[in-house]
Amino acid sequence: MIIWFAVVGVVLTWAVFQSPALDYRLVALGAVLPVTESPWGAGFLHTLLAPTLVLLVIMLVTTGRRLVRRRWLGLPIGMYLHLVLDGAWMWTETFWWPVLDRSFTPGSAPEFSRGWWSLVLDVAGVAVGVWAWRRFGLDDPERRSRFLRTGQLDRTFVTGGRG
């Protein structure tokens, strides 16, 4: 579950935004954050409201600080991607909370309701991860160190060139 959300979330974000200033580590963190509540069922982090509130706070706190904002936007982007990659909209009472329902429906979170499909998704996540490792040149120690230190991918890879 975690590999699927973290890796595919980062790759999808890169494919859409291709931003050199975005912290892709925060995208991965945002994408796996809702999994932390999964043992107790789908709760607040599986709602559309959670990433929207995080986005609002980031927009307010980073007013006038464009680069700081761009870096931190990875967190709500990852949280939104979790909802997409999880199919969270199919649990409408939770997804639209508190609009459709004032309480969370008891039961398992989407991550635990798939059974073996969760393993299949993680294997797919590993395959995407191998592709991304090569595509972003993370076998190069300098590029890998930069990614681990700053969360940024090498500019030549982000803008479509091969370094």
What are these regions (language model features)?
Residues 1-163:
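N-terminal membrane-targeting hydrophobic helices
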